[in-house]
Amino acid sequence: MPKELEKLILAISHLPGIWEKSATKLAFFLLNSNQNFNESLASSIKDIKSKVTYCKNCFSLCDLKQDFCEICKNDSRDSYTIAVVEEYLDLVIIEESWVFKWKYHILGWAISPINWVFIWDLRFKELFERIEKSDENVEIILATNPNIEWEATSSYIIEEIEKRKLKYKTKITKLSRWLSSWYIEYADNITLINALKERKEV
């Protein structure tokens, strides 16, 4: 096999969920694809790191020249309800339900000492600043996955909010039992909507 083809297969196999057999199929697909398609794909891959940035408010993704994402800029959204999620993909999945019109805060991970992810690695400071700046009561929805890491993360958020002398009440809610055995990424739309609609105050 040509070295460049082997190199491409190896690179593709590093993508999440792609094993060597699938990587080989994709490499041969690209080998037989139109050159314009390949160049466009290569350009998009190259630009993804240089032309996409993080929203300064919620840490969602936006175009490089923008300070805030489309959700944060949307005044029709409920600014006093903030869904805290682990990553951008969780936001996308919730948004695909077309039901909820609140705002978000992306922490970037969950507390996980075994993976060397600690409190200072996450965007807690920015979350608490958003709560403190609010001029009304706020609801914080812990839209998180049912695992040990997120139990620790949720507990930290709850404890920190309770310790602070906030001017307005902060209501903290968790997803209902509908999502007790499902990760947000894998939950079907109805299960996720029910889990969010029937969220419980902690």
Each language-model region and where it sits:
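Histidine/lysine/aspartate-rich catalytic loop segments that bind and position anionic ligands
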Residues: I94-I114
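Short functional micro-motifs and their immediate structural scaffolds
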Residues: C62-L64, R77
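Extended, structured, electrostatic nucleic-acid-contact surfaces
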Residues: M1-P16
